[in-house]
Amino acid sequence: MKLKIPAWVGTIIGMLSMGMMPALGAEQIKFSYSILEFSLSVTDLKTYAQEGKISSQLAFYTKRLKPEDLAQGRQVLTERQQLSPVAISQFLYSDIGESMLKSAGQLIQTDSGQNGFYAIRAALILAAADPGGLTLLNTMRYFPSQSIRINSEKLFALMNQLSTLNKETNQAIAIIAQQSTTEASTEPPVDISKLPELYNKSGPFSWQKRTIAFVDTNRKSLTGSIKTRVIQTDIYLPQSQTPAPVIVISHGLGSDRDSFAYLAENLASYGFAVVVPQHPGSDSLQMQALLTGRRQQLFPDTELIDRPLDVTFVLDQLEQRSKSDPWLQGKINGQEVGVIGQSFGGYTALVLAGARININQLHKDCKPESDPINVSLLLQCRALALGKNSPDYEQLQQNLSNLDLRDRRVKAVIALNPVTSSIFGQAGLSRIEIPVVIAGGASDTVTPVFWEQIQAFSWLTTKEKYLGIGDKGTHFDLIAGVSTVVLPSSNRFSERDPELGRIRFQAFSTAFMKLYLAHQTEYRPFLSTSYVKNSNRYEPIKVYFVRSLPPEFLQGLVRKK
């Protein structure tokens, strides 16, 4: 349950740019505290990383570190990142990449004390082109300064932010764990022997899969321009005698239709027609295009609008096709739709449920430099760039805040690791009126669970709401298949099998959609706090599951906000 904050060396090496491989100097690293100035030899770091020997100078800094911290620091110093110079260059020249560099450059400065923006970028690109590859030690060789100056004030502020977030997250999870115990004690006992078997078992339906390219030739932008959008979509159709409820799965940034194929197959076996669109502009193909120089941005700003419109368009097309296509005719119930989304897909699901973009909140939270703690703001703040080149920018932004993209066919949603805090805020999320699950992981460094999921849950006003928190969960645990990520992830499956979490998620998703789409009340016990709490006894990964948060905790959130 505890969030690990790396010690001094780990902080500098691994956290300064939230997962981006940093460059720390050529011959020495300098940092000051009050009137004192300290330095650390890069040669000493190299010897330690390659041979494990700690010099007397390095020992001054490492004597208070635990052995596991030292081992982690040594690994990060020598770990090679599989990124080509073209890929790293393309990302660092994108708007999001430059925002990250500016933020990192405030902390990692040149010898003269200037922002390290250009020096870091040059060093990373040159190191990626070196035969030795992009490692921290190799990057040091290319940093265009004899030394690097660490802005100690920024460093201590960063460490304080991390410590505060760690404390708040641990306190929140402890309260949620206690709340789950309280809720379980007030619920009627669940006789597990009388429940349907959902774990490690496919459902009774056979199914067929087809891929259809849906072409929207009339996609309108905020400015009124028209474009064509091709949405490759996998459809998993159960062989059922009655029309099947529909579940849409929306992938995250840089992922694709394969990311949750395991979930789609399982849901289809339980009688759901599963629709998995691939969002052009924020999928793996967009990421590959960026990294090979064929695109300039991680994703177009318009994806914030186009993603939910993709789902609505595909649902419209399926409804039309079901009237004439023998494969679909009489097979789907397009008025009973659920949406499951992860990360950017979680945002998509919440928009379809009725959440609205909160321009006022974004103006309060979005700064010129990225937040080094909450990297998800890089995505959320892109909403402020929508229409920025138009003379009617202010009016377009106002239109965006009033834009209602809810699809009323959507009756229930599950949002995994969604971005929420600034893009929606309380005003945007409180508009949702349908059943919602918000789920996250305590070890998520991309969308911090305290800000992006726990806080978001507290803002929901819908009666049917659920919060699930994995005590060791990361941002990527439930993603299967090959997913393109730009930056090396700090989330590692070290001592746990992600397959266990996916099996539990399959079972929960099936029960949730059976209850709210198929209206089969016998599945309600699976959604009880007591059932989930009982399941924790047999699993290495604990999931804390609640329907509400205690009033005193909510009051604390209001004070922080």
For each predicted feature, which ranges?
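Cap/lid segment of the alpha/beta-hydrolase catalytic domain
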Residues: 254, 258-261, 266, 275-309, ...
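Short beta-strand element of the alpha/beta-hydrolase
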Residues: 243-252
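Active-site-adjacent alpha-helix of alpha/beta-hydrolase-fold enzymes
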Residues: 430-502
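Gly/Ala-rich beta-loop-alpha elbow adjacent to hydrolase catalytic centers
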Residues: 252, 341-349
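Short glycine-enriched nucleophile-adjacent loop
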Residues: 316-319, 346-358
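N-terminal cap/lid segment of alpha/beta-hydrolase-fold proteins
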Residues: 184-242
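Alpha/beta-hydrolase active-site loop
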Residues: 296-334, 366-385, 395-399
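Mature extracellular/secreted ectodomains of secretory-pathway proteins
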Residues: 49-192
